[in-house]
Design a protein with these regions (language model features):
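A generic secondary-structure signal for well-formed alpha-helical elements
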Residues: 6, 10, 20, 24, ...
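Bilobed periplasmic-binding protein/Venus flytrap-like ligand-binding cleft at the lobe interface
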Residues: 89-99, 150-157
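An aromatic/glycine/proline-enriched structural segment found at the starts
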Residues: 13-79, 172
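Solvent-exposed, non-transmembrane alpha-helical starts
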Residues: 27, 81-85, 143-147
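Short, surface-exposed connector motifs at secondary-structure boundaries
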Residues: 8-13, 88
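Active/ligand-binding-proximal structured segments within catalytic/core domains
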Residues: 72, 82-96, 103-106
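M16 family metallopeptidases and their MPP-like homologs
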Residues: 1, 11-17, 68-78, 106-174
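Short, surface-exposed beta-strand/loop micro-motifs that present aromatic residues
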Residues: 1-5, 54-62, 136
Length: 174
């Protein structure tokens, strides 16, 4: 049902890589896909605009998983929504939480010993909203709530103390 509903040449993207020129690519695409007829496909649904105050909390557990991970996920601009923010958010993610020299890792893992690990990730590859995620695993004896409070405090502190020289180092690595 899904295939017949959505799979149509007018709703597809053809990706080619390797040692091929444009002329040959067009000939091969026409040979293999040219006979396929255009079909009507359902109109894409647009994501509703998010209210800034929308919040939710989800807790999940599985008997086979003993550890705890806490995450904060934020709606963030995607390539399709606002490409002008992509580089800045990528730099922010690297600066704040990618690797052992990041601000959150230094503060929460090395200094305060609240987390075993902490990291950030920015994913702009979505049709509508992308995501910016901060996740951490608490040290033994640290509750998820305590760790989330520490994450929030470390984030706020790092933003206040933005270091231009360190930001430049992050940019050079990208």
């Amino acid at each position: 049902a899904f295939y017949n509903k959505f799979y149509a040449p007018n709703n597809a993207v053809l990706v080619l890589s390797g040692d091929i020129d444009v002329k040959t690519a067009k000939l091969l695409a026409e040979k293999y896909y040219g006979k396929l007829k255009r079909r009507e496909t359902p109109e894409r649904l647009e994501m509703p605009k998010l209210e800034e105050s929308q919040r939710s909390r989800i807790e999940m557990s599985r008997p086979q998983i003993k550890g705890v991970r806490v995450s904060r996920n934020f709606a963030a601009p995607s390539y399709n929504m606002a490409p002008e923010y992509i580089y800045a958010l990528s730099v922010l993610s690297a600066y704040m939480g990618e690797g052992e020299t990041s601000k959150l890792y230094k503060k929460l893992v090395l200094e305060d010993r609240k987390a075993l690990t902490v990291g950030t990730a920015y994913d702009p590859a979505a049709r509508s909203y992308g995501t910016f995620t901060i996740s951490a695993i608490p040290q033994e004896g640290v509750s998820p709530e305590e760790l989330l409070e520490a994450v929030d405090a470390a984030w706020a502190e790092a933003l206040v103390q933005l270091d231009n020289a360190e930001l430049e180092k992050v940019k050079q690595k990208m």
